[in-house]
C-alpha cells in the first residue's frame, strides 16, 4: 500500500520559484485595475491624518538607485501608517524647472536656443519635463510605490505657480525680499547665479601662490621702502580685483628680514614662511599685534591701485601667512568686509566667465585660464614669493559639475537675517530623525548668508516684479500679486513672456513709490528652483480643490541628508517667513548609496547599479528588502553580491510563506480554529513568540527603525519558524487525522502566524504579500488587496511568563541535543534524527525538570525516542557535555523498526492489516475507512 497517499501533505498553488520580474508587473496591473490607492483612502477616511510630503525629484533622466531608495523608504512609511490607524495619503511630485532641463532640451531636441522665442523655448522645456515625469512615474510605480499617481503635483502646474508667487509676494510684503549688489556663487557654464544649496565640493588642483604687496604707507610701524605684506591664495585670477589685505586683530605678526627685503607674516606661520624662502635664519625685526596694522597701505603688485590693511576675526592660522587677500567682487566674506570698510567692488568678469575690458590685458581670457597669466605678471614684477600646485576641496556646480566662482552682480535675495531667530526656534519644534539632523540644520541656518533667489534663466517661474518707468524702483504689491495669480492660474507663467508688461500690470496701477503711472517694465530673471520646491508645502498642502486629502503642515519630510542644506532648508525658510511655523513636524534623513567599499556610485569606477536592471533580473521586492535591511541613518552599501544575499534571504521568507499556505489548504479559520486553552504547550509557546515578534516589529515601524523590522522578521522566519516550530510540527500536520484537535491546533497557530506575517511585511514586500494574499485561506470576508488590511495587534492573552521560562530552558537543552545528533550523523551512526534515541543524563534539579516535560522531548528533538536518566548513570558511555549546566547527551540508534508511514522507530506490526506501521498510524488509518 502507498501510505504516502494517507498523509496530509502540503499542497498550494503558491509557486516555489518567485519569478518576480514576470509576476510583479501582473500584480501592478491588478492594483491599477482595482484602483488600490483610492480603496485604501476610502477605507481610512475619517482617521487621523499622516501627511508625508514628497520632496520632488528632478524630471530629468531615469530614476537611479538613490531616488529608488528614497521612494521605497517613503512607501514603507506610508503603507505602514495606512495600516496602523492613519489616513496616510501620498501625492508624489516633480521638480520641473531649471537649467538642466534647458540644457537637455537643447541637446536632445537639437534646437538652437537663440533661434527660439522665450515662449517657444519654454514650451519645449515643458514637453521634455513632462516626458520624464511620465517615464519616472512608470518606474516608481514599478518599484511597488503606491500613490496618487494620476494626480501628482508638478512645479510647472499653474495652480502650483500661483501659490509660489503668493509666497514670494508675502515675503516681499514682510520686507524679506530685496535686490542688491553682492558677491554670489556663479556658474560660468550655466551662466547664472547659484544658491549655497546648489554648490557641492569636490577635489581640484589649483596653483598655490605667495604674493608680496609692497608697503607704501606703513603708518610709522612698517618701513615704507623695502617692506611687503605677503598674502597666500589658490585663486591667482582674483589678484587683479584686490583692494585690501586682511589680518586678525588679535594675532601676532612679525617682520622677517631676508635678502634685503622685509616680509610681514603671522608669527605662528613664520617657520613655514622661512622654509618657503629657503632662509631658515631670516630674523625677526619687529613684532606687531594685528589690530595695530589697520590702515597700513600697500601697492597692488601690477595695478595702479592701493591695497589697505583691514581687520577680521575669520582669518585663521591653518595655512598661508595669516594675511588674506581681499577682493570684494569675488568672495562673500570679502564683500561683507568691503561693505564695512567702504571698499570698492571690482568684478571684471562677465556671465560666461571671461574677463572684460576693465581687466586690461586680461580682456577676453577665461577666468581660470588667467591664472598662469597673472602668475607670470607677478613674477615679472618681483612680487611672486612662492609658487606650487595643491589639491584641495573646491566649490562646483552640482548640476554641471564645473567649478564655480564668486562674482559681484545685482541679484534678488531673501533676507535671512530678517527672521533667522525665528528659523532657529522653529527647528527646535521639529522632530529630527536621526537626532543629529537638528544640530546640522541649525548650524547651516545660523551661518548661512542671504538667499540669492534670482536666476538668469528662462525656464522657471518668473520673479513677479515690475519696474516703474518714472522712478525706476521695483513694484510688488498685494494688487500686483493678486492680479498675476489670476493670470497665472488661467494661462500659466508663460503669460509673463507672451505678454508685454503693460498687459500684465493691473489696470490703473500706480507706483507706490512715486505715484507715477508711467510705462512699467518687468523683471526678466526667474526664481531659484529651490524656491519652487521650497514653496511646495504651501502650493500643495493647502489646495483642497486639487488634493483634498492633504493638510498643512506635513507630518514628515523624508529625504537624503544633503537636503538639510537643500529642500529642508528652503521649505523651512519660506514657511517660517510666511507663517512663522515650520512646514513639517518631523524630518527623516537617510544616507547615500555606496558600493561595498564605501565608494560613491560612479561610471568611471564601474560600480553603478541601475535599479531598472535590478528589477528586470531580480524583481522590485528584492530591492525593497535591501532598503529595509540597511540602516538608512548611514550610507547604504549595495553590490551584486549584496543583492544576491538579499535574494537568498527573500527565498527563505518566501519558503516560509509557502509552507504556511501549503499546510492550511484544508483549514477554515471560522470552522477549524482551536481555542487557546485547548492548544498544546508547544503551540501556546509559538503564539507567545508571535506576540513578541509582532510587538517588536510594530515598535520598530513606529520608531522608523526599518532595519530592525527586517532583522526581526527574517530571524523569526529562519530561526523560530523554519528551524524550530515548523520542523517539529510536521509529524502532527502530516500524520495525525486531518480534523483532529492535535492537527487543527497546529493549523490554528500557522494561520495566526501567516495572518500576522503577511500584514507585517506588506510595507516591505509589496508584491509578494499581495501574491500570498491571493492564496490566503478564504473565510468569506477577504478584501481584494492585502493593502486594505490593518496591522496585527499583539495578543496579551498569549503572554505567559512561566511558559516562556520553561520553553526557553527546553530550547537550550534542544540545542545541546541537536549538536549531539549532528555529531552522530558525522560519525555515520545515524542518517537523520528519527533514527536516533537521545539519552539525557542530568543532575537532580534538571532531571526533575526534564521528566516533567518528557512528553515534549521527542517532539522538539524530532527523534524517535528520548530517555532521561540521572547524571550518575552516564558511566563510560560517549555522553557529551554542552552549554546547559548539569547535562550530558548521548545518541544511540533508536530501538524498534521504522514505521513506513511516519518514519519513526518503535513498535510495528500490531495491526495485522498494516504490519509495517506503528500503532498510532494504524489508529489513524482505521478512521479513514480505507
Swiss-Prot record:
GO-annotated molecular function: aminoacyl-tRNA deacylase activity; ATP binding; isoleucine-tRNA ligase activity; tRNA binding; zinc ion binding
CDD domains linked to this entry: Anticodon_Ia_Ile_BEm (cd07960), IleRS_core (cd00818)
Keyword Disulfide bond attached: no
The keyword Nucleus belongs to this UniProt entry's keyword annotation: no
Record-listed ATP binding positions: 603
Domain of life of the organism encoding this protein: Bacteria
Keywords for the protein's UniProt record, in alphabetical order: Aminoacyl-tRNA synthetase, ATP-binding, Cytoplasm, Ligase, Metal-binding, Nucleotide-binding, Protein biosynthesis, Zinc
Cofactor notes: Binds 1 zinc ion per subunit.
UniProt motif 'HIGH' region: location: 57-67
Ligand binding (L-isoleucyl-5'-AMP): 559
Broad class of where this protein is predominantly found: cytoplasm
Record-listed Zn(2+) binding positions: 899, 902, 918, 921
Cofactor entry: Zn(2+)
Enzyme Commission identifier(s): 6.1.1.5
Class in the EC hierarchy, top level: ligase
Family: Belongs to the class-I aminoacyl-tRNA synthetase family. IleS type 1 subfamily.
Function: Catalyzes the attachment of isoleucine to tRNA(Ile). As IleRS can inadvertently accommodate and process structurally similar amino acids such as valine, to avoid such errors it has two additional distinct tRNA(Ile)-dependent editing activities. One activity is designated as 'pretransfer' editing and involves the hydrolysis of activated Val-AMP. The other activity is designated 'posttransfer' editing and involves deacylation of mischarged Val-tRNA(Ile).
Subunit text: Monomer.
Protein name: Isoleucine--tRNA ligase
Gene: ileS
Amino acid at each position: 500500500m502507498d501510505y504516502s497517499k494517507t498523509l496530509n501533505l502540503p499542497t498550494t498553488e503558491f509557486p516555489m520559484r518567485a519569478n518576480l520580474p514576470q509576476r510583479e508587473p501582473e500584480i501592478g496591473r491588478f492594483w491599477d485595475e482595482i484602483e488600490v490607492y483610492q480603496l485604501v483612502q476610502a477605507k481610512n477616511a475619517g482617521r487621523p491624518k499622516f501627511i508625508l510630503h514628497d520632496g520632488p525629484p528632478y524630471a530629468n533622466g531615469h530614476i537611479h538607485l538613490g531616488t529608488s531608495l528614497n521612494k521605497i523608504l517613503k512607501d514603507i512609511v506610508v503603507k505602514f501608517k495606512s495600516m496602523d490607524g492613519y489616513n496616510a495619503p501620498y501625492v508624489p511630485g516633480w521638480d520641473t524647472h531649471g537649467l538642466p532641463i534647458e540644457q537637455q532640451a537643447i541637446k536632445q531636441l537639437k534646437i538652437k536656443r537663440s533661434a527660439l522665442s522665450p515662449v517657444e523655448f519654454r514650451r519645449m522645456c515643458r514637453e521634455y519635463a513632462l516626458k520624464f515625469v511620465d517615464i519616472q512615474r512608470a518606474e516608481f510605480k514599478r518599484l511597488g510605490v503606491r500613490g496618487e499617481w494620476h494626480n501628482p503635483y508638478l512645479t510647472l502646474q499653474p495652480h502650483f505657480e500661483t501659490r509660489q508667487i503668493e509666497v514670494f509676494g508675502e515675503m516681499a510684503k514682510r520686507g524679506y525680499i530685496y535686490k542688491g549688489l553682492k558677491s554670489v556663487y556663479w556658474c560660468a557654464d550655466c551662466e547664472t547665479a547659484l544658491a549655497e544649496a546648489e554648490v557641492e565640493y569636490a577635489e581640484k588642483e589649483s596653483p598655490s601662490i605667495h604674493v608680496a604687496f609692497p608697503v607704501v604707507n606703513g603708518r610709522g610701524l612698517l618701513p615704507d621702502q623695502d617692506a611687503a605684506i605677503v598674502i597666500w591664495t589658490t585663486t591667482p585670477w582674483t589678484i587683479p580685483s584686490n583692494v585690501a589685505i586682511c589680518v586678525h586683530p588679535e594675532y601676532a605678526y612679525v617682520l622677517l628680514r631676508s635678502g634685503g627685503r622685509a616680509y610681514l607674516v603671522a608669527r605662528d606661520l613664520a617657520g613655514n614662511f622661512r622654509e618657503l624662502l629657503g632662509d631658515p635664519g631670516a630674523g625677526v625685526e619687529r613684532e606687531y599685534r594685528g589690530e595695530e596694522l589697520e590702515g597700513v597701505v600697500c601697492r597692488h603688485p601690477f595695478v595702479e591701485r592701493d591695497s589697505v590693511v583691514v581687520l577680521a576675526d575669520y582669518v585663521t592660522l591653518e595655512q598661508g601667512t595669516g594675511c588674506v587677500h581681499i577682493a570684494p567682487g569675488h568672495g562673500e566674506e570679502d564683500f561683507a568686509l568691503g561693505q564695512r570698510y567702504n571698499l570698492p567692488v571690482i568684478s571684471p568678469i562677465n556671465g560666461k566667465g571671461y574677463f572684460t575690458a576693465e581687466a586690461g590685458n586680461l580682456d577676453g581670457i577665461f577666468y581660470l585660464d588667467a591664472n598662469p597669466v597673472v602668475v607670470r605678471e607677478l613674477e615679472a614684477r618681483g612680487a611672486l614669493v612662492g609658487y606650487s600646485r595643491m589639491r584641495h576641496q573646491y566649490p562646483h556646480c552640482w548640476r554641471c559639475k564645473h567649478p564655480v566662482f564668486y562674482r559681484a552682480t545685482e541679484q534678488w535675495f531673501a533676507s535671512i537675517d530678517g527672521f533667522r531667530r525665528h528659523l532657529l526656534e522653529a527647528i527646535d519644534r521639529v522632530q529630527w530623525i536621526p537626532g543629529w539632523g537638528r544640530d546640522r540644520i541649525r548650524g547651516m541656518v545660523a551661518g548661512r548668508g542671504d538667499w540669492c533667489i534670482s536666476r538668469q534663466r528662462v525656464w522657471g517661474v518668473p520673479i513677479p516684479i515690475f519696474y516703474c518707468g518714472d522712478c525706476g524702483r521695483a513694484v510688488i504689491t498685494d494688487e500686483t500679486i493678486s492680479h498675476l495669480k489670476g493670470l497665472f492660474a488661467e494661462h500659466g507663467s508663460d503669460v509673463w513672456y507672451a505678454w508685454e508688461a503693460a498687459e500684465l500690470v493691473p489696470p490703473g496701477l500706480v507706483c507706490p513709490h512715486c505715484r507715477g503711472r508711467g510705462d512699467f517694465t518687468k523683471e526678466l530673471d526667474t526664481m531659484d528652483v529651490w524656491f519652487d520646491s521650497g514653496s511646495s508645502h504651501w502650493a500643495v498642502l493647502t489646495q483642497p480643490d486639487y488634493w483634498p486629502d492633504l493638510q498643512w503642515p506635513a507630518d514628515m519630510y523624508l529625504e537624503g541628508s544633503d537636503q538639510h542644506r537643500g529642500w529642508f532648508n528652503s521649505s523651512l525658510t519660506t514657511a517660517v517667513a510666511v507663517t512663522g511655523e515650520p512646514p513639517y513636524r518631523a524630518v527623516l534623513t537617510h544616507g547615500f548609496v555606496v558600493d561595498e567599499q564605501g565608494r560613491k556610485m560612479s561610471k568611471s569606477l564601474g560600480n553603478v547599479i541601475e535599479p531598472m536592471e535590478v528589477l528586470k533580473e531580480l524583481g522590485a521586492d528584492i530591492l525593497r528588502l535591501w532598503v529595509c535591511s540597511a540602516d538608512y541613518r548611514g550610507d547604504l552599501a549595495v553590490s551584486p553580491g549584496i543583492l544576491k544575499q538579499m535574494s537568498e534571504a527573500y527565498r527563505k521568507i518566501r519558503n516560509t510563506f509557502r509552507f504556511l499556505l501549503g499546510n492550511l489548504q484544508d483549514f477554515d479559520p471560522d470552522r477549524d480554529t482551536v481555542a487557546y486553552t485547548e492548544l498544546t504547550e508547544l503551540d501556546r509557546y509559538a503564539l507567545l513568540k508571535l506576540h513578541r515578534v509582532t510587538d517588536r516589529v510594530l515598535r520598530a515601524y513606529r520608531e522608523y527603525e526599518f532595519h530592525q523590522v527586517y532583522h526581526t522578521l527574517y530571524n523569526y522566519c529562519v530561526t523560530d519558524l523554519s528551524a524550530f516550530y515548523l520542523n517539529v510540527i510536521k509529524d502532527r500536520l502530516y500524520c495525525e487525522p486531518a480534523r483532529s484537535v492535535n492537527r487543527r491546533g497546529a493549523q490554528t497557530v500557522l494561520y495566526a502566524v501567516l495572518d500576522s506575517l503577511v500584514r507585517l511585511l506588506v510595507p516591505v514586500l509589496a508584491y509578494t504579500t499581495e501574491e500570498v494574499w491571493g492564496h490566503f485561506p478564504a473565510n468569506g470576508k477577504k478584501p481584494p488587496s492585502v493593502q486594505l488590511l490593518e496591522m496585527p495587534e499583539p495578543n496579551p492573552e498569549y503572554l505567559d511568563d512561566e511558559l516562556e521560562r520553561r520553553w526557553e530552558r527546553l530550547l537550550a537543552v534542544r540545542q545541546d541535543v541537536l549538536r549531539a545528533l549532528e555529531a552522530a550523523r558525522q560519525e555515520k551512526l545515524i542518517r537523520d534524527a528519527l533514527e536516533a534515541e537521545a539519552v539525557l543524563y542530568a543532575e537532580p534539579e534538571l532531571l526533575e525538570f526534564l521528566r516533567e516535560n518528557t512528553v515534549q522531548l521527542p517532539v522538539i528533538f524530532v527523534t524517535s525516542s528520548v530517555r532521561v536518566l540521572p547524571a550518575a548513570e552516564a558511566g563510560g558511555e560517549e555522553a557529551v557535555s554542552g552549554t546547559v549546566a548539569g547535562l550530558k547527551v548521548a545518541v544511540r540508534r533508536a530501538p524498534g523498526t521504522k514505521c513506513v508511514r511516519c518514519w519513526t522507530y518503535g513498535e510495528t506490526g500490531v495491526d495485522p492489516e498494516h504490519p509495517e506501521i506503528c500503532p498510532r498510524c494504524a489508529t489513524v488509518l482505521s478512521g479513514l475507512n480505507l
